[in-house]
Amino acid sequence: CRKVQKGQRMFNQSPAFQILRGGLAESAATSKKEFISAYITDTRLMGVVGLVLHWYLPENLTKDHFFQFFYMDAEEYGFDTYRSVLTAGTGEDALEAVDELRSVENSLIGCLGGKKTPLTEREARAVVQQYVDFNLRLKLPLPEGIEEYQFLLGPHITLDSDEALALMKKQSPVFTSEFQVIHYFLMR
């Protein structure tokens, strides 16, 4: 170590330091997100829908895939349940995450039965915003984890009538027989 005299400046002559991010720093809430896919169940006529969004997190080094699961009740409870899974896209961690993804999906959406209909990012954001608005209007609490889904709440999406109808059709099954119609009304 060299002794520095008063008034003299000491310059660091060692190589530049590099900051390495650890895996614990990876977070879905603060990471940049790129939309991969989304789907909604066609169970709206039952009064509830399940929504799943899949994001790629390009800035994360290991856990670079983020899945969001929403359970929404259109009649009474609004946006009722939120769960998420942050996982690696490849390797052994990804295989382990498959079980967790299936478990979360089955617990929230599997019981609904309906078909899974693909959505665009715009449609998925609109659905989340509609149910958050529902909760706020009825003074219902939002599910925990808002720091992970609040990015979906802005900017506000306004669907025109054609877009709104197309989105409603994606959430509702097509009746192909009179028996299905009768069954629907009996179950309601």
What are these regions (language model features)?
Residues V4-R188:
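Non-catalytic terminal/accessory regions
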